[in-house]
Amino acid sequence: MPLSKKSAISFIFITLLIDCMGWGLIIPVIADLVAELKHIPVNEASTYGAYLLSAFAIVQFICAPIIGNLSDKYGRRPILLLSLLGFGIDYIIQAVSPTYALLFFGRVVAGVTGASFTTASAYIADVSPDPTSRAKNFGVIGAAFGLGFVLGPALGALLSSWGIRAPFYAAAVLCLVNCVYGYFFLPESLPKENRREFDWKRANPFGSLKFLTHHPEIGGLALSFFLIYLGAQAVQSNWNFFTIYRFNWSEKMVGISLAVVGILIGVVQGGLTRIVVPKLGNNKSIYVGLTLYVIGLVLFAFATEGWMMFAFLIPYCLGGICGPSLQSVISGEVPPNQQGELQGSLTSLMSLTTIIGPLIMNGSFAYFTSNDAPFVFPGVHFLIGAICMLLGAIIAYSVLSKRPAKKMNAAGVPAMEPSVPSPNETV
């Protein structure tokens, strides 16, 4: 008996929740761990933290389209389980690592199998028949990440009192338990009749990016997508390093702040998105969300007290209504049997931002807190992020404002056009 769509969404929510808790556990301690292994101050350690993020992203960039195409051939379930197993192994390596080099190697291992977001996004697309439900269900992914970032950092902050490596062991256990749970309970979302053969041409990481230019709307919105995720790296890659340096935050305070981020993201993407998107439509949700992102980043840049970071998280996290709407518009342009390839391509774009972003954001932070800088400005990377978001908003508007009115329903949500793909269709 086929599972209901609601049950399928619940399965993927729980899977991503536990997976995200594992990553959230280690964020409060990773900055101090890198500083300890390299024997340098935390602002200098931010550069080495960027190398870890970039190493993971480079490998994921190469592997994501391969994983996406494999999920189109074999289904989402086995690929997702492999990803969880890889992350579990990565956390074990980091837990026992005596050197920065081994820590680096662990990130590479995780990059090879780091396809949970790619496969989960394709899974959501499989069980979401129309743009409105697709935007809402992509919001459920955000809610899982948000709740994971509430529980993960909070638990990581508590576990850090037992040692800087304790959160890594806990993260490994969570990922491996999640893998076992998924093996027994996670259903397959892609019917055999909607699968297609693996093709190395489609699995080429650079070739997969050409998929995004198959339709003009996808090409332009993909560039906006890239700039938005690049701007977000100002927060994602350097929050812990910045707050420890600027406000002398402890691991516990970093964990608490990230737990607050998780609560806000959960409220926005798990609840507010379901109310706002149907009323505003995808287009307006994108514009409003990006405006709030820019405001939040500019405020972060000039914060002078630690409490301000908590206050400024409100407009920044409210900007999260943008993401599900933008992804819904993009995914609505392709048929069901290409969703895995599309999500693999989008993940490749995200990986590119995680290759470039940390080097730019952490690098600018490290430089403007060093003796070589003409002046000290720790928040410079937030301004860079705001500029990226602003450019993304301009590009999104230029593309969406040219979309024919017949593609929009009464709610302002793009209506999906009929599409009958050939079984051997290639990009």
Where in the sequence are the language-model features?
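Helix-breaking motifs and short loop linkers at transmembrane-helix boundaries and internal kinks
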Residues: 75, 96-101, 113, 248, ...
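Helix-to-loop junctions at the C-terminal end of transmembrane segments
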Residues: 63-75, 268-282
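C-terminal transmembrane helical hairpin of 12-TM major facilitator-type secondary transporters
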Residues: 283-326
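Conserved MFS/SLC helix-loop-helix module at the cytosolic interface between two early adjacent transmembrane helices
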Residues: 61-100
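Cytoplasmic helix-loop-helix junction between adjacent transmembrane helices
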Residues: 106-146
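Juxtamembrane intracellular "pre-TM" segments in multi-pass secondary transporters
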Residues: 1-4, 187-224, 245-246, 413-426
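Short amphipathic helix-loop junctions that connect adjacent transmembrane helices
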Residues: 29-46, 237-254
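A membrane-interface helix-boundary motif in multi-pass transporters
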Residues: 160-173, 363-388
